[in-house]
C-alpha cells in the first residue's frame, strides 16, 4: 500500500506542475488524515512539496481560495458549510453543480445546485442594472452562439450533458498522465514495478516539470480559465452561463401642461427598463390633480412601470384652489347612524389650500366655535364639489353626542381653520345601544308622587316627580364619579330616585321626571346670578358660560345613563317648569326674549341628545302654563304660544330633526275655580288658537288641534300638572272636575298622560285656597279619591257618572269622541 500511496503522491506533484483539468479534490480525497505523513515521506528532500505550493498559490489567487493544499480536513477556526448551500464563493468546495454567472466578462455570481436537485433545477432570474440595456437570455457561450435559456427554464439536460463531458474529460486526463484503467491484478503488478523505479528516474521527471513551470512564467501565460473553474468547484461539475443583453429602445414622453409649468425632474424619454415616478407640475391658483393618458381625464397615471413600451402623451389635470374660508365647505348632515357612530357628510366646492392633503372633522366649542380637537381626517377630493364622509366612534366619549362639529383644514403643525358651518348631531337616538321601545302604560291616568304606596293605592299608571339639581349636587352620601370630556365630576347617586324608578318599572308604571335648578348654595355656579325677584322659585341654565355648560352637559349625560337602563328607566324628561313664566320658574337674567329662547333651547337640545343617545325611545318635553295668548302675572313672562313657536323655530335651526314634545299645565282659570265647564267668560276660552286667551281643560282641544296642525301628530302632549280644588264648590265638584277632565284627555288621541297635582292636600296650598289632594291634610279620603282610583277602569261610570250628572249635567256632549272603550285603554288614534 505504501508504494501505491507514493505513486499517487508523484501523480499529484505532476498535476500541480503541469496544467490539468483534473480537480485537486479528486486527488485530495485519496488522503486521510493519517496518510499525510506518508505523502510527506515522498517529498523528503522538500523540493517537490515546495514546487507544488507555488503552483497552488497561483490557482488560488485566480479563484480567491486559500493558499494551503486541501486535505479534506477542517481547520478549527473555519465553520463547516452545508453541501446544499445555494451560493458559494469562488474556490469554495461543495457537492453539486457549480453554476458560474458571467456578464460582460465579469463573474457576477456563483452558486451550487446539489446533485439531488438536478431534475428540478431551473435557470436563474434575469440580471438587473445594466443601464440602457434589457436582459435577453442566458447562453452557454459568451458570444451568444450557444444554447439559450430563459429565466425559469429547466436545465436538467444541461446538467446531464455537463456530467458526461466531465466524465469524458477525467478519462482523457488520466490517460495523459499515464494512467490506464486495468484489471486489479494488473494494478498490483504496476505497484511492484513502481517500487523498482529508481530515484534518478523520479528526479528527471520532476526536473522536467519544473522546467515547464519556469517556461510558463517566462512567457507570461496562465493556466486555462476552464481549469481554474474546475478547481474552484471542488467536488462539483462547473457550468458557466453568460448574460446576453440587447440595447433598450427609448420612447418619447410628451407633456400637455394646460397652462402649467412642468417639474424639471420629469424625463422626456424612457426605456422598458426604467421605472418612472412622475413629479407634480405647478400652476398658480390651481391644485394639480394628476397626470392622465387621455384628454378626457379618464385614465390616471403616476408611474411608468418597468417593462412598459411605447411613446406617451400625458395630460395635466387641474382644479381651482381657494384660500380657507368659513363657507368653503357645506355640511350635508351630522347625525347618528348606528350605535356609537356619528356620520358626517360634507361637500367641498373647491380644493382648499392647506399645509397637508387632508380635510379634518373637528370638535368645536359650542359657545365660541373654536376648534377643541380633531376627531377624524380624510384625503382631500381632487375635484370641484368633492364629497367627503367621516365616521366617528363615540364609545367612551358621551360629550360627542351633545357636541358640535365642523370641517377644518390644517394651517400649521398645531393650528386649524374651520371651513364649514358648525352643526350638532341629529338623530341621537341612533347612537344608543339600548333599542328598547317607548313604554306605553295601560291608561293615561297619573299622579305626582315620590311614594310608591300612593301610586299603587290610587292604581295610577304614570308618575311624575321633580328632580332638583341640588339633589344631584349633594355630597353628604352616595357620591359617584363621572368622566365627561376629559374631566371627572362628582354627582350624587340619587339612590332614592333609583329605587322609586325601579319599583315603577317593575309594576308597569310610566315614569316622568322634571329637571329644575332650585335656589341653593350648590347650584350657584349654574345660573347667571341671583334673581332680584322674590317670585323666583327656579332658575335656568347659564349656557353662555363654557364651564357651566360643560357641567350641565355632564349632568345630563350622567342622568341619561343612570336612568336609561332596562331595569331603571325614565320614559319622559321635562326641562324646567312653566318656562314661559321666566322670572318665576326659569330665570336667566333680564335678557331679551330671543336670548331667553336661545338659552333655553341650548339646554333643551343638550338634554335631548344626552338622554336619547342613552335610551333612544326617551321623550323630552318643554313645559308651558295655560296663559296661551296672554302673559302671566310674573315680572318677566311670555305667552305660552309665543314661547312654543319661538322655541320650535330655534331648536329646529340649532339641530335638525329634534322631535320635541309638550308638557302642558291645563289648570283652570282662575286656579281656585274647579268648574271649568261653566259658560263664564266664554270669550277667553275659544277654539281658535289665534285668539283664545287661555287654554284649559275647558278648551283643551284647541291646543291639540293647533299642535297637530302646526307640528304634526308625532309631537306628543302630556298634561303633566293640573289640579282641582275642593275649597270652593265642595268635594263633589272637585270629583266631577277630575272625572270630566280625564275623560276629555283619554278620548283625545294627541294626549298621552293626564297627571293630577297631589295625593293629599298640602298646608301651604290650602292657605291659598287650593285644596287639590285626593285626601285632606289629615289623610281622610275625599269624594275625589274613589273617582280618581277607578275612573280609568272598565267600571268607570259606576264611580263617576253620579257626580258628573249632578255637577255637570250632559257631560258626554263635552267629551269629543267619547266611548267607554277609550276610557279604559291607552287611546292614541
Where are these regions (language model features)?
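Sec-dependent N-terminal signal peptides of Gram-positive bacterial secreted proteins and lipoproteins
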Residues: 4-24
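Sec-dependent signal peptide cleavage junction
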Residues: 18-40
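Secondary-structure capping and domain/repeat boundary segments
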Residues: 85-189, 201-321
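Beta-strand-enriched, solvent-exposed domains that form extended recognition/catalytic surfaces
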Residues: 322-433
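Boundary/entry segment of secreted carbohydrate-active catalytic domains
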Residues: 419-469
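Substrate-binding cleft and catalytic face of glycoside hydrolase catalytic domains
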Residues: 461-481, 486-630, 669, 761-766
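Aromatic-rich peripheral "rim/lid" segments of glycoside hydrolase catalytic domains that contact
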Residues: 584-585, 728-733, 737-829
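Noncatalytic carbohydrate-binding groove/subsite architecture in carbohydrate-active enzymes
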Residues: 596-731
Amino acid at each position: 500500500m505504501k508504494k501505491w500511496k507514493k505513486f499517487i503522491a508523484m501523480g499529484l506533484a505532476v498535476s500541480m506542475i503541469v496544467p490539468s483539468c483534473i480537480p485537486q479534490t479528486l486527488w485530495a480525497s485519496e488522503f486521510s488524515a493519517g496518510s499525510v505523513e506518508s505523502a510527506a515521506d515522498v517529498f523528503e528532500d522538500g523540493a517537490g512539496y515546495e514546487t507544488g505550493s507555488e503552483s497552488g498559490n497561483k490557482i488560488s489567487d485566480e479563484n480567491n481560495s486559500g493558499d494551503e493544499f486541501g486535505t479534506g480536513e477542517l481547520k478549527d477556526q473555519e465553520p463547516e458549510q452545508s453541501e446544499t448551500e445555494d451560493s458559494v464563493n469562488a474556490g469554495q468546495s461543495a457537492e453539486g453543480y457549480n453554476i458560474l454567472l458571467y456578464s460582460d466578462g465579469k463573474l457576477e455570481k456563483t452558486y451550487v445546485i446539489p446533485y439531488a436537485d438536478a431534475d428540478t433545477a431551473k435557470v436563474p432570474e434575469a440580471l438587473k442594472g445594466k443601464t440602457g440595456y434589457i436582459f435577453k437570455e442566458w447562453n452557454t457561450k459568451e458570444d451568444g452562439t450557444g444554447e439559450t435559456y430563459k429565466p425559469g427554464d429547466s436545465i436538467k439536460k444541461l446538467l446531464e450533458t455537463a456530467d458526461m463531458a466531465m466524465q469524458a474529460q477525467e478519462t482523457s486526463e488520466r490517460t495523459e498522465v499515464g494512467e490506464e484503467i486495468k484489471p486489479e491484478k494488473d494494478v498490483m503488478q504496476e505497484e511492484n514495478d513502481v517500487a523498482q523505479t529508481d530515484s534518478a528516474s523520479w528526479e528527471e521527471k520532476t526536473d522536467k516539470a519544473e522546467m515547464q513551470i519556469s517556461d510558463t512564467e517566462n512567457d507570461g501565460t496562465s493556466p486555462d480559465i476552464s481549469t481554474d473553474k474546475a478547481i474552484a468547484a471542488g467536488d462539483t461539475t462547473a457550468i458557466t452561463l453568460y448574460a446576453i443583453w440587447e440595447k433598450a429602445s427609448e420612447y418619447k414622453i410628451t407633456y400637455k401642461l394646460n397652462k402649467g409649468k412642468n417639474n424639471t425632474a420629469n424625463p422626456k424619454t424612457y426605456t422598458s427598463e426604467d421605472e418612472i415616478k412622475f413629479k407634480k407640475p405647478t400652476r398658480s391658483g390651481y391644485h394639480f390633480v394628476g397626470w392622465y393618458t387621455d384628454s378626457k381625464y379618464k385614465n390616471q397615471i403616476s408611474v411608468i412601470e418597468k417593462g412598459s413600451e411605447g411613446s406617451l402623451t400625458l395630460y395635466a389635470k387641474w382644479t381651482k384652489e381657494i384660500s380657507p374660508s368659513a363657507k368653503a365647505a357645506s355640511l350635508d348632515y351630522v347625525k347618528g347612524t348606528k350605535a356609537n357612530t356619528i356620520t358626517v357628510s360634507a361637500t367641498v366646492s373647491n380644493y382648499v389650500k392647506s399645509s397637508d392633503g387632508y380635510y379634518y372633522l373637528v370638535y368645536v366649542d359650542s359657545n365660541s366655535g373654536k376648534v377643541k380637537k380633531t376627531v377624524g381626517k380624510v384625503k382631500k377630493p381632487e375635484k370641484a364639489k368633492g364629497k367627503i364622509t367621516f365616521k366617528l366612534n363615540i364609545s367612551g366619549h358621551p360629550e360627542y353626542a351633545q357636541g358640535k362639529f365642523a370641517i377644518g383644514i390644517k394651517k400649521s403643525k398645531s393650528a386649524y381653520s374651520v371651513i364649514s358651518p358648525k352643526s350638532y348631531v341629529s338623530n341621537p337616538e341612533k347612537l344608543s345601544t339600548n333599542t328598547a321601545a317607548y313604554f306605553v302604560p295601560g291608561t293615561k291616568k297619573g299622579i305626582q308622587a315620590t311614594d310608591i304606596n300612593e301610586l299603587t293605592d290610587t292604581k295610577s299608571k304614570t308618575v311624575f316627580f321633580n328632580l332638583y339639581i341640588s339633589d344631584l349636587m349633594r355630597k353628604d352620601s352616595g357620591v359617584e364619579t363621572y368622566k365627561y370630556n376629559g374631566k371627572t365630576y362628582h354627582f350624587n347617586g340619587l339612590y332614592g330616585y333609583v329605587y322609586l324608578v325601579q319599583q315603577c318599572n317593575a309594576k308597569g308604571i310610566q315614569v316622568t321626571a322634571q329637571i329644575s335648578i332650585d335656589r341653593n348654595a350648590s347650584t350657584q355656579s349654574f345660573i347667571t346670578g341671583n334673581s332680584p325677584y322674590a317670585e323666583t322659585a327656579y332658575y335656568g341654565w347659564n349656557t353662555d358660560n363654557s364651564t357651566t355648560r360643560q357641567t350641565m352637559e355632564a349632568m345630563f349625560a350622567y342622568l341619561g345613563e343612570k336612568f336609561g337602563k332596562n331595569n331603571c328607566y325614565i320614559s319622559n324628561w321635562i326641562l324646567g317648569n312653566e318656562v314661559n313664566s321666566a322670572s318665576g320658574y326659569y330665570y336667566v337674567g333680564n335678557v331679551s326674549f330671543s336670548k331667553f329662547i336661545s338659552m333655553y333651547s341650548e339646554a333643551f337640545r343638550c338634554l335631548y341628545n344626552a338622554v336619547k343617545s342613552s335610551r333612544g325611545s326617551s321623550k323630552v318635553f318643554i313645559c308651558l302654563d295655560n296663559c296661551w295668548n296672554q302673559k302671566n302675572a310674573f315680572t318677566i313672562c311670555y305667552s305660552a304660544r309665543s314661547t312654543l313657536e319661538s322655541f320650535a323655530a330655534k331648536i329646529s335651526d340649532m339641530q335638525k330633526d329634534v322631535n320635541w314634545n309638550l308638557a302642558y299645565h291645563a289648570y283652570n282659570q282662575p286656579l281656585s275655580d274647579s268648574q271649568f265647564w261653566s259658560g263664564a267668560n266664554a270669550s277667553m276660552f275659544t277654539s281658535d288658537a289665534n285668539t283664545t286667551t287661555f287654554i284649559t281643560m275647558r278648551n283643551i282641544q284647541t291646543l291639540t288641534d293647533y299642535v297637530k296642525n302646526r307640528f304634526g301628530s308625532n309631537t306628543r302632549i302630556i298634561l303633566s300638572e293640573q289640579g282641582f280644588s275642593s275649597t270652593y264648590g265642595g268635594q263633589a265638584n272637585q270629583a266631577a272636575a277630575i272625572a270630566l277632565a280625564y275623560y276629555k284627555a283619554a278620548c283625545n288621541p294627541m294626549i298621552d298622560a293626564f297627571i293630577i297635582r297631589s295625593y293629599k292636600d298640602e298646608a301651604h296650598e290650602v292657605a291659598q285656597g287650593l285644596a287639590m289632594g285626593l285626601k285632606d291634610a289629615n289623610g281622610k279620603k275625599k269624594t275625589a279619591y274613589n273617582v280618581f282610583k277607578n275612573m280609568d277602569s272598565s267600571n268607570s261610570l259606576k264611580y263617576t257618572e253620579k257626580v258628573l250628572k249632578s255637577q255637570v249635567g250632559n257631560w258626554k256632549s263635552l267629551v269629543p269622541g267619547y266611548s267607554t272603550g277609550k276610557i279604559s285603554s291607552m287611546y292614541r288614534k
